[in-house]
From Swiss-Prot:
An MF annotation (GO) of this entry: ATP hydrolysis activity
Top-level taxonomy: Bacteria, Pseudomonadati, Pseudomonadota, Gammaproteobacteria, Lysobacterales
Originating gene: lolD
Name of the featured protein: Lipoprotein-releasing system ATP-binding protein LolD
Chain sites annotated for binding ATP: G55, A56, S57, G58, A59, G60, K61, S62
UniProt function note: Part of the ABC transporter complex LolCDE involved in the translocation of mature outer membrane-directed lipoproteins, from the inner membrane to the periplasmic chaperone, LolA. Responsible for the formation of the LolA-lipoprotein complex in an ATP-dependent manner.
GO cellular component, one term: plasma membrane
Length: 244
């Protein structure tokens, strides 16, 4: 049996896609030089689904994640988030859609150093137009759920690496997004702490039915997600469990 199959990468029938990419292409240009990253990628992520994206360094995994999140513009093709075609939106509209429908967790936490853990997690709620009381309530609930209820008044410099990343996870989930995009979210942590943060993300995925799309080099973590997709030579292919 062929362990690797070229991915049209469809979701289960009748599932609602929180993110969909159609014929996605990205080429970088510098002067007369053209460097194609990938061409004609199709991807659909269902509500509550967890997807790992693996591949060699430089394969374009982070580029793909940025395109899915509307942080970069594809050379060709379309990305749909919560049913909205990203290319049809203005910069302001894309920003609003990202804040409402997507969460982001990176290898480095990107917490604002001058703000406390509570204030950092409140930020996306405030940006969505809700008042301070609502933002504080939602942020406190998430910080409690990630085990940081006793650290809400601490700034990032006063938190451990694992605590900072848990705070970043809380920030990503505070608006109850349809999908969280993670770029090596545990890559900067020791194995034990990485496992704790990963378990936390899976627990919140189950509790909130938030989809996860995680770029990772850790095949062990990848195997625990619903699907594993490998980006190889500009193509996405789905790996059978025994091939991961």
């Amino acid at each position: 049996m062929n362990e690797i199959r070229e991915a049209v990468v469809q979701t289960p029938e009748q599932a609602t896609a929180v993110i969909r990419a159609e014929a996605l292409a990205k080429t970088y240009a510098e002067g007369k030089m053209r460097t194609p990253v990938f061409d004609g990628l199709d991807l659909s992520v269902a509500t509550g689904e967890t997807v790992a994206i693996v591949g060699a360094s430089g394969a374009g995994k982070s580029t793909l994640l940025h395109l899915l999140g509307g942080l970069d513009i594809p050379t060709a093709g379309e990305v749909y988030v919560a049913g909205e075609r990203m290319s049809a939106l203005s910069d302001a509209q894309r920003g609003k859609l990202r804040n409402q429908s997507l969460g982001f967790v990176y290898q480095f936490h990107h917490l604002l150093p001058e703000f406390t853990a509570l204030e950092n997690v409140m930020m996306p709620v405030l940006l969505s137009g809700k008042n301070v009381a609502v933002a504080k309530g939602q942020a406190l609930q998430l910080l409690e759920s990630v085990g940081l209820g006793h650290r809400i008044d601490h700034k990032p410099s006063e938190l451990s690496g694992g605590e900072r990343q848990r705070c970043a996870v809380a920030r990503a989930l505070v608006n109850k997004p349809g999908c969280v995009l993670g770029d090596e979210p545990t890559g900067n942590l020791d194995d034990k702490t990485a496992g704790t943060v990963f378990e936390l993300m899976l627990e919140l995925n189950r509790a909130q039915r938030t989809s996860l799309v995680l770029v990772t080099h850790d095949r062990g973590l990848a195997r625990r997600l619903d699907r594993v997709l490998e980006l190889h030579q500009g193509k996405l292919r789905e790996l059978a469990p025994s091939a991961v």
